[in-house]
Regions:
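Bacterial Sec-dependent N-terminal signal peptides
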Residues: 1-26
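TPR/TPR-like (Sel1-like) alpha-helical repeat modules
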Residues: 281-289
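Charged, long alpha-helical assembly modules
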Residues: 178-257
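Structural signature of alpha-solenoid helical repeat junctions
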Residues: 171-175, 253, 257-260, 273, ...
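A non-transmembrane, solvent-exposed segment enriched in polar/low-complexity residues
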Residues: 18-203, 207-209
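N-terminal "domain-start" segment that seeds a small globular fold
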Residues: 290-325
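Helix-turn-helix repeat elements of alpha-solenoid scaffolds
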Residues: 150-156, 234-242, 273-277
Length: 342
């Protein structure tokens, strides 16, 4: 009997599962205004919906249940604010749009977790700066210095401990982990080099699949590359190859985003003269049996396979039965070009 009741409950839940969720907005000082909700798909921004407010400034936003991520709400093409979408029905109230901090969001656990997370992050980074300054000043007083070092370690873990404390089903957990890492990496390069190794662990713990609708992928791969290229030379390429493996594997079920990330990362690696990592990424994608590359990706990556060190370049047909190899000239100038080159 218990099994039958459980089955009926599961069937009922499936029947009444929501396909869409709504956000009820009220901006009393902006009646008859146009609203646009924009989300992300990989690197691309896309319009999720458009709507208008009535004469009282009230409006309704509807978003699909399968869109889990961030979105930007634009009003009249100008004012915007960050929203989190994860199968929640909630309300917005904004009396004065010139005061972003005054926007009230009720009924969203995602947004509440985000606000607390950003507050924790800002407080921790501010305290960290002070403690990092004090530690070397007390080099002659080891007892006091150890007190500051211990406090420094505690403060350094404040934000990550908060993120880890969030429930697994809160999507903003992944967003905060990624956004925090993006914000911290440049500071670690410039001011806190001792913190850099922990960022490698944090990067490898990120769920890339969960970032599909985050709008953070571009900043993440660029920031991590910028961080790692400042490691000792013998560590740079192993760390980059490890990161490339992670991204390619985690996006194997989404070839469009996989190629988008790979193309951008490849170009970024080349622009930073990290050619060995660029070659590794190119060959990884070309040998990826789970993904059919589009023309742009194939053209971009093939240059490393065809022009790899040790390969013999193909002879060039110059017409009239003449080839480059047959020319007896002492000097030969060969200019290469391709239709995909800008």
């Amino acid at each position: 009997m218990k099994h039958i009741l459980l089955l009926l409950l599961l069937i009922t839940n499936n029947l009444f599962a929501q396909d869409t969720y709504t956000i009820q907005g009220h901006f009393p000082k902006f009646p008859n205004s146009n609203f646009e909700l924009k989300g992300y798909e990989g690197f691309q921004e896309k319009v999720l919906l458009k709507t208008s407010s009535n004469e009282e400034g009230k409006f309704t936003l509807t978003y699909p249940a399968n869109y889990v991520g961030v979105a930007q709400l634009y009003m009249n093409g100008a004012y915007s604010n960050l929203l989190f979408l994860n199968q929640e029905n909630y309300t917005l109230f904004w009396q004065d749009l010139t005061k972003r901090e005054d926007m009230q969001i009720t009924g969203s656990k995602e947004y509440e977790a985000f606000l607390q997370g950003m507050k924790t992050f800002q407080e921790a980074e501010a305290k960290l700066a002070g403690l990092n300054y004090l530690v070397p000043l007390y080099a002659a007083d080891s007892i006091k210095q150890q007190v500051f070092i211990k406090e420094l370690d505690t403060v350094n873990n404040l934000f990550s401990n908060y993120v880890k404390s969030l429930p697994e089903n809160i999507w903003v957990r992944q967003y905060l982990l990624t956004k925090g890492l993006i914000e911290q990496m440049p500071n670690s390069v410039k001011t806190y080099p001792w913190r850099a190794p922990q960022h490698v662990t944090e990067f490898m713990a990120i769920d890339f699949k969960a970032l599909k609708h985050s709008g953070l992928l571009k900043e993440l791969v660029e920031g991590y590359t910028y961080l790692v290229e400042r490691f000792p030379l013998e560590e740079v390429y192993p760390l980059l190859e490890q990161a490339i493996d992670k991204a390619v594997i985690e996006f194997k079920d989404n070839p469009t985003i996989q190629q988008e990330v790979a193309q951008h990362w490849f170009t970024f690696l080349e622009s930073h003269s990290l050619f060995k990592a660029a070659e590794y990424l190119a060959l990884k994608m070309l040998n990826n049996e789970s993904c059919t590359l589009n023309e742009k990706s194939t053209a971009l990556f093939e240059q490393y396979r065809k022009l790899a060190v040790g390969n013999t370049a193909s002879d060039i047909n110059l017409g009239s039965g003449t080839t480059l190899k047959k020319l007896k000239n002492k000097y030969k100038l060969v200019v290469f070009g391709a239709s995909w080159c800008p």
